[in-house]
């Protein structure tokens, strides 16, 4: 989530996304803070723009996974409740052209804990998500307690819970996917690094 207090700048940034779901952010600016570069990131790629102070945006470049000759999967945000009642969020990437029913599942765990998984193409593990989904796997990512972006109290819930409730959050995510009918409980793998 972003909040832009300058209404004119907010309008310019929103226009870059063209109404599509996207993360739009300023990546740099000059000393006058009037000319800047902005990035529009989706689950399919990123575009960088130069935003001159008084003229139309100029496309600087694109990083698009969709240029690959492969069917790309869509990543959707999900919400679930941990066994102790804590609300959790994450992301689910499903293979294209396959019924989302009892799929093999890879639980893709981010490092940290004081980082998080993100939706956009700039997210860590985006290429791995697409690789696995392209081969028929559902990919589940859970922002377990201690992940950044949910406030200090959420981060502090990780204290003393590295092999406890943080682990439970991941298991609860897999159980959620099984209960939704998306994942086959006999075909679950876990992958991650820090």
Predicted regions and their residues:
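Structural motif
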Residues: 1-10, 44-50
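Trp- and S/T/G-rich repeat-edge/linker motifs of beta-rich repeat architectures
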Residues: 12-15
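Surface loop/turn motifs at the tips and blade-to-blade linkers of beta-strand repeat domains
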Residues: 17-20
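Serine-hydrolase catalytic core recognition
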Residues: 25-194
């Amino acid at each position: 989530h972003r909040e832009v207090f300058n209404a004119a700048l907010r309008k310019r940034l929103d226009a870059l996304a063209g109404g599509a779901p996207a993360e739009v952010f300023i990546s740099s600016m000059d000393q006058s803070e009037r000319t800047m570069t902005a990035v529009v990131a989706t689950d399919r790629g990123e575009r960088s723009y130069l935003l001159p102070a008084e003229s139309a945006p100029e496309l600087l470049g694109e990083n698009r996974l969709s240029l690959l000759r492969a069917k790309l999967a869509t990543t959707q945000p999900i919400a679930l409740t941990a066994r102790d009642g804590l609300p959790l969020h994450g992301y689910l990437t499903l293979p294209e052209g396959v019924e989302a029913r009892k799929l093999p599942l890879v639980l893709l765990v981010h490092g940290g804990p004081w980082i998080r998984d993100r939706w956009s193409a700039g997210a860590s593990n985006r290429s791995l998500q697409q690789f696995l989904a392209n081969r028929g796997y559902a990919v589940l990512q859970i922002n377990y307690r201690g992940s950044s972006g949910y406030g200090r109290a959420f981060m502090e819930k990780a204290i003393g819970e590295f092999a406890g409730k943080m682990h439970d959050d991941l298991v609860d995510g897999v159980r959620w996917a099984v209960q939704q009918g998306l994942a086959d409980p006999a075909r679950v793998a876990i992958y991650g690094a820090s």
